[in-house]
């Protein structure tokens, strides 16, 4: 359908006297249709040269069809072709720019939403961390309270143990003192029994001794009366008088005066009226009432 009309291009790229684009030799990159009114087909190569020219001129807003045609230097390219293509290029760039702006707006909105969601999530995380820290603080406080109560209970148990030990020591000392007192009482009782037995033996020996001397055979040790010092003094004096009288009697035997004197002296010397038997060989004198 399409046919390419090719012609040679000058090496310097000059356009000669055909600056308006008419009656120009056709460039090799131009492709025209075979219609009665041929139309230009913008190939990729031609479009690239157009874009390069527009870029060199400062963009689609500053470039004009004439400046673009001069910059491109393509023979056979008219102002009509460049004007329509430049208009389409501007519209395409504008739509691309709008689409880019829209995409930027969308991305900004998305970023703002992401920022909002991230801030919300950060607030949630902060609240969760604060709640967890509060729970940890409460748990630590409860643990410290339990430890304090346990320490108090241990202190009470320690004091109670000390009191129990002190009371046990006190009771042990009282028990030792009681055992010691009982032992002392037992020793004293044994000594008392020994003394009692010794006294009984001495009394029996004394009664046997008196029986051998002829005083009496029925001598009661329980009724034995030991004379006092005054009675012993009177008995000794009476003994002396008796010895004196015996000497007088031996010198005046058969005298009635001596007989009366002997009768007169045979009277009691103790306060109770008992007579005293005085022997020459006796060591001490007993009352007559104590002799059975």
Swiss-Prot record:
GO terms for molecular function: DNA-binding transcription factor activity; sequence-specific DNA binding. It is found in: Nucleus. GO terms for biological process: double fertilization forming a zygote and endosperm; positive regulation of gene expression. SUPFAM superfamilies: Homeodomain-like. Induction: Up-regulated in roots by low Pi. Disruption phenotype: Embryo lethal. Residues 34-94 form the HTH myb-type domain. Residues 137-157 form a coiled coil. Residues 65-90 bind DNA. It holds the Pfam family Myb_CC_LHEQLE. Keywords: Coiled coil, DNA-binding, Nucleus, Transcription, Transcription regulation. PANTHER family: MYB FAMILY TRANSCRIPTION FACTOR PHL11, PROTEIN PHR1-LIKE 3. Belongs to the MYB-CC family. Homo- and heterodimers. Interacts with PHL2, but not with PHR1. This is Protein PHR1-LIKE 3.
């Amino acid at each position: 359908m399409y046919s390419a009309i090719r012609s040679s291009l000058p090496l310097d790229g000059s356009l000669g006297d055909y600056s308006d684009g008419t009656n120009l030799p056709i460039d090799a990159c131009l492709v025209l249709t075979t219609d009665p009114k041929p139309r230009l087909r913008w190939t990729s190569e031609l479009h690239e040269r157009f874009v390069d020219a527009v870029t060199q001129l400062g963009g689609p807003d500053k470039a004009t069809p004439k400046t673009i045609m001069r910059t491109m230097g393509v023979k056979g390219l008219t102002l009509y072709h460049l004007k329509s293509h430049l208009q389409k290029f501007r519209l395409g760039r504008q739509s691309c720019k709008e689409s880019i702006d829209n995409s930027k707006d969308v991305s900004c909105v998305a970023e703002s939403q992401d920022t909002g969601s991230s801030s919300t999530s950060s607030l949630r995380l902060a609240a969760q961390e604060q709640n967890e820290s509060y729970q940890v603080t409460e748990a630590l406080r409860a643990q410290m309270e339990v430890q304090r109560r346990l320490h108090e209970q241990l202190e009470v148990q320690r004091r109670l143990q000390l009191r129990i030990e002190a009371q046990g020591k006190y009771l042990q000392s009282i028990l030792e003192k009681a055992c010691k007192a009982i032992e002392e009482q037992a020793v004293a009782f044994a000594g008392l029994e020994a003394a009692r037995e010794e006294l009984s033996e001495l009394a029996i020996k004394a009664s046997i001794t008196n029986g051998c001397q002829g005083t009496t055979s029925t001598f009661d040790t329980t009724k034995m009366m030991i004379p006092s010092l005054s009675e012993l003094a009177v008995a000794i004096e009476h003994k002396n008088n008796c010895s004196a009288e015996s000497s007088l009697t031996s010198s005046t035997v058969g005298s009635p005066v001596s007989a009366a004197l002997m009768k007169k002296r045979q009277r009691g010397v103790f306060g109770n009226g008992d007579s005293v038997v005085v022997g020459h060989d006796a060591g001490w004198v007993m009352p007559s009432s104590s002799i059975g």
